[in-house]
Amino acid sequence: MNSLLMITACLVLIGTVWAKDGYLVEKTGCKKTCYKLGENDFCNRECKWKHIGGSYGYCYGFGCYCEGLPDSTQTWPLPNKTCGKK
């Protein structure tokens, strides 16, 4: 039983370490904007959407910042795409 608990704890820890953090990005290449800095329901909801897959989100530097994102989620800055330019 103790071994099972240790294995489970290690898997949870590994998942946390391998998760990435970053700003949500719009199709334009800009950060997803927010205005209420700190704890922010909008950013938290956006980060936790199924297609985003984050564990927590808040407003930092007027952009939605997400923690615990899978590697497949794009974060700002996008390579070869400048905010607002084509």
UniProtKB/Swiss-Prot annotation:
- Tell me the GO BP annotations in alphabetical order: defense response
One cellular component term (GO) for this entry is: extracellular region
Q: Which residues get modified to Cysteine amide?
A: C83
Extent of the signal sequence: 1-19
Give the domain note.
Answer: Has the structural arrangement of an alpha-helix connected to antiparallel beta-sheets by disulfide bonds (CS-alpha/beta).
Q: Of which family is this protein a member? A: Belongs to the long (4 C-C) scorpion toxin superfamily. Sodium channel inhibitor family. Beta subfamily.
Protein name as catalogued: Beta-toxin CsEI
Q: Which organism is it from?
A: Centruroides sculpturatus
